Design a protein with these regions (language model features):
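Bacterial N-terminal signal peptides that target proteins for export
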Residues: 1-6
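Bacterial N-terminal signal peptides
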Residues: 7-15
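Feature marking well-ordered beta-strand scaffolds used for ligand recognition
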Residues: 21-793
Length: 793
């Protein structure tokens, strides 16, 4: 049986070459056959996809027995996005193989191990066809869909067995399909009958075409479309289909609601001659709302499992039915749940064989995905275990430093004047499945000189020793508090050998305080899991923590969810006694922030020594406040003062910035101006601070890239920008109003430099050794070195 599911089809359309996603996506496709379960994990950009094979050990537990990888796999090939199996033959799609033309790999079972035996391609293939979207196999035929062909019109290809080989037989393409229909999304095959869906046809109503094989003409002849009443735009009729014993089921997850997210329904047809006639309609029992019932279907002729992945507020459910062939009646048997919580989307895809069923929750493990195995007794399905894949990614790069070549490449990463010293993938830093990096900071041990990287992650802070930068060593981790939840955002800063950690959208997280001297003497042979040394509970969640090391004050910004939020503005904390933080007051500039509460997304607080003599020696905070630059004098914590507010053209989201070392300029990024279309290229705002009361936008520096900017830092006359998909950008700001690009290192070696928010989150350029550490969310930690080239080089 199958399977590729609705989300995979949508993902394929959104991820043609040039616009990739990066999620792990365990369970893109599944198939169950006897006591074996096959699970695809296709959505890798930094490596080829994989397919896992699971079976039972002697105790009855489900374990991984094989991991299948293609012999000619390449990063981002989507290997595993479609599966089909018949007896000892297994088909695995790789829709983006060969520059998007796509291919289907053929495997044979040899003594319990699946061995690659061939590869199917089409004779008229072209880039971006995405061969392998729909997939079906019988003893004599293999049918393969290619939804992206001809501007997503789509097509299907028939391959017929000839001896031990599969030979391309014909191309199947109805005369009335249009651009964007995605014909070939799903294929169901039984004997000489075949159904092929185009779920985006007719503006999303969806179509399902019927074909019959004629031995006389040796062709698959179109025999009409399946009729379904009440379809509307984005019903997506044909999202999933199944055939068994002359009965077919067709899912329409947008039915009773539309927009692809209705209550959903499954249409049941019976075969009369060569015509499929509508017999009944299945709708979910004991559930209402936009649950997308029919997004996935499994049917063996006597029972059906139907996924509704949006049921229960996104937890997901699978509905079980039994079928009486004599009366053509259906009986609701049970509703199957997993033990996942939150928006796990259980039921995104489902399959079963005999008394073994598998349902995928592709939102589990923070989007990495998981699958649940169920066993049936007397029509009741009970959980038999949870299965997941491995933590995969790029290989670690350690040892000798890799110079950026004259061609602008270092170990496969585009670069200029930035050398790759080393790289640690997520799995080498204690990350579990679905965990990604975010912010980064550093600490140098004043006694030993050790340089330690503080790596923010979804649920923890990892410690990596880069004293020997070519051989980075993972020392351990500080998990989030037990009262918190995992979150995209984590931020860390250091004061007097103590680390302070906050997290946004993390519930009752508060601020963790950790004594970094506890890392002394560790060599990584036994990575430690630490507990905080102190915990500050006057805030719950916060977007960033700002520290002025000269004064011993910290500033929680973007606070929310409980405690004293200060409207998201500056929540001031005295940390002069590092383990005993004390609330010191609030500052809010009510003319800033989207809700006009003074919300600050990030800030920098310093003892000012710039050109404005009125404020020299004062403690000044410069806030990136969503809508504007905010400048505050917080010298007197009991009476903080607004100094200035300055807006600028084409605001998207004032995000983060950093002062020049002489405090004459403030360089600021706007996170949403690129993705929102406010500007065409990556923009950096340059503020002239000669008069703090009247900051002047001196220049908008436009890079040649289109990536979204994120965090930037300045050391001397050099600015280090982390700009998501374009990676680390190094600029010479000797002439502050005319920055010059002097180096770069792309941490995301795929998918161009569009404005999507994946890639380099942040960097830390302040180690005395001269290395710069860079986090890239789904890749890991890069240790690089900016090395200006001479003319002779």
């Amino acid at each position: 049986m199958k399977r590729i599911y609705l989300a995979s089809i949508v993902a394929l359309l959104a991820s043609m070459p040039g616009t990739p996603g990066a999620s792990q996506a365990f369970g893109n496709a599944i198939t169950v056959d006897g006591d074996q379960v096959f699970v695809g994990e296709a959505s890798y950009e930094m490596r080829s996809g994989v397919v896992y094979v699971f079976g039972r050990d002697p105790s009855g537990s489900w374990i991984q027995t094989q991991r299948i990888e293609p012999s000619s796999g390449v990063p981002g090939d989507r290997f595993g996005i479609g599966l089909a199996k018949h007896e000892n033959t297994l088909l695995i799609s790789a829709t983006r193989a060969d520059e998007g033309a796509g291919a289907v790999y053929v495997y044979q079972n040899q003594n319990g191990t699946w061995i690659e035996s061939g590869r199917l391609e089409t004779t008229d293939r072209s880039p971006a066809d995405s061969l392998g979207t729909g997939l079906a196999i019988t003893n004599d035929w293999i049918m393969v869909g290619t939804i992206a062909q001809n501007d997503r019109t789509g097509a299907a290809y028939a391959f017929r067995r000839e001896g031990e080989s599969w030979v391309q037989h014909s191309t199947i393409r109805p005369a009335d399909i249009d651009e964007g229909d995605t014909f070939g999304s799903r294929i169901a095959l039984q004997g000489n009958q075949m159904l092929i869906s185009a779920p985006f046809g007719s503006d999303g109503e969806g179509r399902v075409y019927s074909f019959t094989y004629s031995e006389d003409s040796d062709t698959w002849e179109e025999s009409g479309q399946l009729q379904a009443p009440g379809l509307s735009e984005e019903t997506m009729f044909g999202t999933d289909i199944a055939i068994e014993n002359n009965v077919s089921l067709v899912g329409a997850p947008g039915y009773f609601g539309g927009t692809g997210a209705g209550t959903g329904a499954v249409f049941v047809y019976g075969l009369a001659g060569d015509t499929w006639q509508l017999a009944s309609l299945l709708s979910p029992y004991e559930s209402t709302g936009a649950i997308q019932f029919g997004g996935s279907i499994a049917f063996d002729g006597n029972a059906a499992l139907i996924g509704a992945f949006s049921a229960a507020q996104g937890q997901g459910r699978i509905f079980s039915y039994t079928f009486n062939r004599e009366t053509f009646e259906w009986t609701a048997a049970s509703k199957i749940s997993s033990a996942e919580t939150g928006r796990a989307f259980f039921g995104r895809t489902v399959d079963f064989s005999g008394d073994i069923a598998v349902g995928v929750a592709n939102g589990a493990d923070r989007g990495a995905g998981a699958a649940w195995v169920f066993e049936r007794t007397d029509n009741n399905w009970t959980s038999a275990g949870r299965i997941t894949g491995d933590v995969l990614g790029m290989d670690a790069i350690t040892g000798d430093e890799v110079s950026c070549s004259t061609e602008g490449e270092a170990s496969g990463f585009d670069c200029e004047s930035v050398d790759l010293v080393s790289f640690l993938p997520l799995a080498h830093m204690g990350a579990e499945r679905g965990i990604v990096t975010n912010d980064v900071w550093g600490w140098t041990d004043p006694e030993t000189g050790q340089e330690i990287v503080l790596v923010g992650m979804t649920n923890q802070t990892a410690f990596v020793d880069v004293t020997d930068p070519g051989m980075p060593t993972y020392l351990g981790r500080l998990p989030m508090p037990e009262t918190a939840n995992a979150s995209t955002w984590r931020d860390m800063k250091v004061y007097q050998d103590h680390m302070y950690v906050v997290s946004d959208g993390a519930g009752e997280h508060g601020m963790q305080v950790f004594d970094l001297t506890r890392l002394r003497g560790l060599n990584g042979s036994d990575p430690q899991t630490f507990a905080s040394d102190a915990h500050y509970d006057q805030i719950a969640s916060a977007h960033n923590i700002v520290i002025n090391e000269e004064t011993g004050f910290a500033y929680s910004v973007g606070s929310s969810g409980g405690g004293q939020t200060c409207g998201g503005g500056l929540h001031m904390i005295n940390i002069q006694d590092p383990l005993a933080p004390v609330f010191a007051g609030c500052f809010q500039d009510m003319s800033t922030g989207r809700q006009r509460t003074g919300y600050s997304h990030d800030a920098q607080c310093v003892v000012y020594h710039g050109p404005d003599t009125d404020y020299q020696g004062h403690e000044i905070c410069l806030g990136s406040n969503e809508t504007a630059l905010s400048i505050a004098d917080v010298t007197d914590k009991s009476n903080p003062l607004t100094v200035a507010m300055a807006s600028y053209p084409n605001v998207g989201y004032s995000h983060q910035g950093w002062l020049s070392e002489d405090h004459s300029y403030f360089f600021m990024g706007d996170e949403l101006d690129e993705s929102g279309g406010n500007v065409t290229n990556t923009r950096t705002l340059i503020w002239d601070l000669a008069d703090l009361d009247d900051p002047i936008l001196a220049r908008e520096y436009m890079a040649e890239t289109k990536a979204t900017d994120h965090n930037l830092y300045i050391l001397g006359n050099t600015m280090y920008q982390s700009n998501y998909k374009s990676g680390l950008r190094v600029l010479d700001i000797s002439d502050p109003e005319n920055p010059q690009l002097v180096g770069n290192f792309d941490t995301v070696p795929y998918g161009g430099d569009d404005a999507s928010m994946t890639g380099s989150w942040s960097n830390y350029p302040y180690f005395k050794s001269g290395v710069v550490v860079v986090t890239s969310s789904r890749e890991g930690l890069f240790v690089v070195r900016y090395r200006p080239r001479t003319i002779s080089e």
